[in-house]
Amino acid sequence: MDCEGTDGEGLGCTGWFSVEAIVEKHTGETISEDEIEYSSDTGSDLIGFIDDSNISDGAEQQVAQALFQAQETQANKKAVRALKRKLLGSQNSPLQDITNQSNSQQSTDEVNNLQAKRRAVDSVPDSGYGYTEVETLTPVQVDKHNEQNGDSVCSQGGSSGSVSDMEVDIGAQASSVTKICELLKCSNVKAALLSKFKTVYGVSYTELVRVFKSDKTCCSDWVCAAFGVAGSVAESLKTLIQPYCLYYHIQCLTCNWGVLPLMLIRFTCAKNRATIKKCLCTLLNVPDTQLLIEPPKLRSTAVALYFYKTGLSNISETHGDTPEWIVRQTQLEHSFEDTIFDLSKMVQWAFDHDITDDSEIAFKYAQLADIESNAAAFLKSNCQAKYVKDCATMTRHYKRAQKRSMGMSQWLQHRCSKIEDGGTWKDIARFLRYQNVNFIYFLQVLKQFLKGTPKHNCIVIYGPPNTGKSQFAMSFIKFVQGSVISYVNSNSHFWLQPLEDAKVALLDDATYGCWLYIDKYLRNFLDGNPCCIDRKHRSLIQVRCPPLIITSNINPQDDNSLMYLHSRVTVIPFPNTFPFDSNGNPVYELTDVNWKSFFSTTWSRLDLEEDADKENGEPLPAFKCVPGENTRLL
């Protein structure tokens, strides 16, 4: 600001002398020794050189007031800075980081302060509960301001005293949010969450849960912990979570981060961690980084007792029926039910469900541990692999003995009992008619085939490719649960071993080389006479060859080199291509239900025997390998 009577700084020292003269006159400063040296100079030669006619007393006073105001402003800033260091330097203050800044960064631009405020406000998410921006703005603004400008908050405009008071009050309310913001700066957020959980609840979170590495693994029971939840939101969670679950156990404790709820939730259906994160983030209004979600340890008695005892306290809120894994490990009557493992019960289960594969037995029986005490004892055993192998071996023995004890009529009746009703035999009859096969002729051939009549023990279905030969034969073999042999294994001595336990067998797609092999080695097989079969790691066994179906593109009766097979096979030609509709579905459905309907309709035509000894509609009495139990009390 130029003083009155001065047009500008000008050239040389003209402007300086004009200001200095006024300041010297009114401030009473001591004259320097350099100026005393020229005190003898009267300045008569400079009379009239400076025109001070325009300088008035008002201009002199204005300059003095401006200087005084600048000095007072600087003194006030120093006083405010000293006061803030005194009041905000305690350990419990959320704004204590201000005192760590350097004094060399005290000048602040007003525009930068406003931009820093805007960034701080925009970075705070609105929770929808109260004045979130007001509660979180001040601590964030202090950190941002200290990092960029180094000045105190009180120098950012307005009354310094009122701003300082507001920061202290709001900072006390927003301390929990400040702690959460500090959490995001941690190098290992999960470790910080686990540490805080153990500090608040006195128990390690990892002791309550088992770890799922994948977020896509589904489970019905989950243990969830949330950090930095508002008190009103935590209270309303007990109502908001009910539509999503069958049971919940919620306990809430407070810390300097806010409310920390611990939840054991059984959802209405199995959910994965990613789905639960989305649900809880919506209900609790917290980011997923502030959530711990893992399934509980279902077989840990300590975990069951923890949730059982805390459920009885006044800090917990429960809803719904208690999960069975807690009841089983905490109530006395259920503890009596824990017995040692019984292999016979496992074998009975595998036999009833017709499961003979080791892996399938292990997987499906382990899934019954929640509802079956013997399965739970199986999981607790250290010999699970041995039990699975023994169970599969015994099941196969029982199944093999059961099949051998049945005749063909009993076996077909047994297979029909395993299949639901609702099929139609007409699809099979129409398909045979489509292939120009007389239905009555087919029934006569099938009757002799099922009885194993010599010279009629083998049916050959031949024709061009894509005529449905394999489809027809495979559907029949699947219904009667027969065995399939492949000529590709003919170099092995054991390739005929599946015929040992088969009621009906199939050799699919026999080539000319296969027919030569049959003509050379398997003539007695086609006759249905007893023969000897080599078995791997076991001695030879003498069996009667079961009825055999062969599909081929070659008609053996047309080849004179196979003349010894002409009387041993019954040939049925399939000349027409298998039909499909416009959607690619087969026109004739060759399914198990249709084959059941076929045999039920043609039972008397096929001369199959009725079981006169059957009871309650069952061809054989139910197999039972579990000893009976006396339920009477002493």
UniProtKB/Swiss-Prot annotation:
Residues 437-587 form the SF3 helicase domain. GO terms for cellular component: host cell nucleus. The modification Phosphoserine is found at residue 90. Pfam families: PPV_E1_C, PPV_E1_DBD, PPV_E1_N. Phosphorylated. A motif (Nuclear localization signal) lies at residues 84-86. GO terms for biological process: DNA replication. Keywords: ATP-binding, DNA replication, DNA-binding, Early protein, Helicase, Host nucleus, Hydrolase, Isomerase, Nucleotide-binding, Phosphoprotein. Residues 172-338 are annotated as: DNA-binding region. It is found in: Host nucleus. Residues 91-128 are annotated as: Disordered. The keyword ATP-binding applies. Belongs to the papillomaviridae E1 protein family. Can form hexamers. Interacts with E2 protein; this interaction increases E1 DNA binding specificity. Interacts with host DNA polymerase subunit POLA2. Interacts with host single stranded DNA-binding protein RPA1. Interacts with host TOP1; this interaction stimulates the enzymatic activity of TOP1. HAMAP family: PPV_E1. This is Replication protein E1. It comes from Human papillomavirus 69. The lineage of its organism: Viruses, Monodnaviria, Shotokuvirae, Cossaviricota, Papovaviricetes.
